[in-house]
């Protein structure tokens, strides 16, 4: 498969994952407004899921059993993911206290940690990390880590939190892409620099046999705004200082 086609396919997969999260966010908001819609419709834990979406911790404790906590909704979304997507921190904490597993695979193979890493509000990731969540848990389908999810969503704060919690910058997905490759594919040099400073391997190659610099080199300088150019200069400076500049050449 030509490299350009591979890149478009990888980005399409990432976009679909973000679209799925956005769709469930909208569904959660609708349920909070009293509309009867839930990915748990028809499931035995519907009442529990409704309590989760409302932030009703008493209802959560009254409804929770181990079987109900483990039962998934449509698209395999977990209750803990539903709490995150419903933006209910009290529900997240209540579910964690009841033993909900933040590493369990759910929506599109992601864990709750992946989901929290993608949201704008970082408090949900903070709650999961405070509970000792497995920071390097893999997506059950793609093999991607929460660090990769944060990169794809462009979440700098979550990326920093995951790095501080010990996230491994060198772990790749099933296509061989590390978070550094993904940062280059979506053209975010400032996130790439953070990963490099945290120990990411600049020479790592994916299944296509290319390092992250190849993807950055596909963005012509004349298409960059001033902010992006400044970020590229900082990245170049770091690479030159670590004798890696020959691996990266912009057109």
Which residue ranges define each predicted feature?
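Ankyrin-repeat-protein effector appendages
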Residues: 2, 23, 27-47, 198, ...
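N-terminal Sec-pathway targeting helices
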Residues: 2-18
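N-terminal segments that cap or nucleate solenoid repeat domains
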Residues: 33-82
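Start-of-repeat signature of ankyrin repeats
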Residues: 44, 76, 109, 142-143, ...
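Ankyrin repeat A-helix N-terminal signature
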Residues: 50-55, 82-88, 115-121, 149-155, ...
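Ankyrin repeat structural motif
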Residues: 56-64, 88-96, 121-129, 155-163, ...
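Ankyrin-repeat inter-repeat connecting loop/turn
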Residues: 69-70, 102, 135, 169, ...
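Ankyrin repeat boundary/linker residues
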Residues: 73, 106, 139-140, 173, ...
């Amino acid at each position: 498969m030509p490299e350009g086609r591979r890149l478009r396919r990888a980005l399409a997969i990432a976009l679909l994952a973000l679209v799925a999260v956005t769709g469930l966010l909208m569904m959660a908001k609708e349920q909070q407004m009293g509309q009867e819609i839930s990915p748990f419709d028809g499931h035995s834990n519907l009442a529990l899921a409704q309590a989760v979406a409302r932030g009703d911790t008493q209802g959560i404790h009254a409804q929770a059993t181990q079987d109900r906590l483990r039962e998934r909704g449509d698209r395999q979304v977990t209750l803990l993911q539903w709490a995150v997507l419903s933006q209910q921190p009290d529900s997240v904490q209540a579910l964690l206290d009841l033993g909900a597993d933040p590493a369990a695979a759910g929506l599109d193979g992601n864990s709750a940690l992946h989901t929290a890493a993608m949201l704008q509000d970082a408090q949900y990731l903070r709650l999961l990390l405070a509970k000792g969540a497995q920071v390097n848990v893999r997506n059950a389908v793609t093999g991607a880590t929460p660090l990769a999810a944060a990169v794809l969503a462009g979440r700098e704060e979550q990326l920093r939190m995951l790095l501080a919690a010990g996230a491994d910058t060198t772990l790749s997905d099933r296509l061989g892409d590390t978070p550094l490759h993904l940062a280059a594919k979506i053209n975010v040099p400032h996130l790439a620099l953070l990963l490099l400073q945290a120990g990411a391997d600049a020479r790592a190659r994916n299944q296509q046999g290319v390092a992250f610099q190849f993807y950055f080199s596909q963005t012509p300088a004349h298409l960059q705004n001033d902010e992006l150019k400044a970020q590229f200069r900082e990245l170049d400076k770091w690479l030159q200082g670590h004798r890696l500049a020959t691996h990266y050449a912009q057109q």
